[in-house]
A protein has these predicted regions:
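Nucleotide-activated sugar donor-binding and catalytic core shared by glycosyltransferases
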Residues: 1-208
Length: 208
């Protein structure tokens, strides 16, 4: 038997792939609870089992509670920490980071803040240094996202799995994803979901 772990997001767009998926696989293991009912309505004979999201295994409820309260001395600090998560790919950082820096500038004009950018590797770190204006007081950290989320008061993040981590740590988050006008126009015609941030999709509400 051929088992698929993690369903393609055909519930968002390209539902036409459903027939091919049900032909290619004998079982779908889903990481999002709503996917099982989505498949059952459109392909009742295709077996789908919800097995939970891998992120849940990384964080315990006890750790989450401790991180956001007792272990976070900066939670009510006079200098809140704004965490920027522009993405992991070069194109994402090139498009998202300038927008995030503009947002930070607006916030900094109103209150004193600390700003931290978390990036996945040294290559993206070097790219970010070219984008950040000279003299800007911003820290850049490679990896250790969980530690950064423990102390963040606000996150500005690119859409993706990272938004689930922000939700898990209960950090208020602004989600963005900047693309070309052509891609946006095509996506607007094809995408069938109301929200693009995964926490909002799961909650069926505007959490972020």
């Amino acid at each position: 038997k051929i088992i698929a772990f993690v369903s393609p997001q055909i519930w968002a767009w390209k539902e036409s792939r459903l027939e091919q998926i049900t032909t290619d696989f004998d079982l779908m293991l889903s990481i999002f609870p709503f996917e099982k009912s989505w498949y059952s309505k459109r392909a009742p004979k295709f077996p789908v089992e919800f097995v939970g999201h891998p992120l849940v295994d990384r964080f315990s409820i006890e750790k989450k509670e401790n991180n956001r309260i007792s272990s976070n001395p900066d939670l009510f600090s006079d200098e809140p920490e704004v965490l920027l998560l522009p993405g992991s790919r070069q194109r994402e950082i090139e498009r998202h980071l300038p927008v995030m820096l503009d947002a930070v500038k607006i916030i900094a004009n109103k209150i004193k803040i600390k700003v931290l950018i978390v990036l996945p590797n040294e290559k993206m770190h070097n790219l970010a240094k070219y984008i950040i204006p000279t003299g800007t007081e911003i820290l850049i950290q490679i990896g250790s996202l969980e530690k950064a989320l423990e102390h963040a008061n606000l996150t500005i993040a690119s859409s993706g799995t990272v938004t689930l981590e922000c939700a898990w740590f209960r950090v208020p988050t602004v989600v963005l994803y900047k693309t070309s006008f052509l891609t946006y126009s095509i996506g607007k015609l094809l995408v069938k979901i109301r929200y693009f941030a995964m926490p909002n999709i799961l909650a069926e509400n505007e959490v972020f």
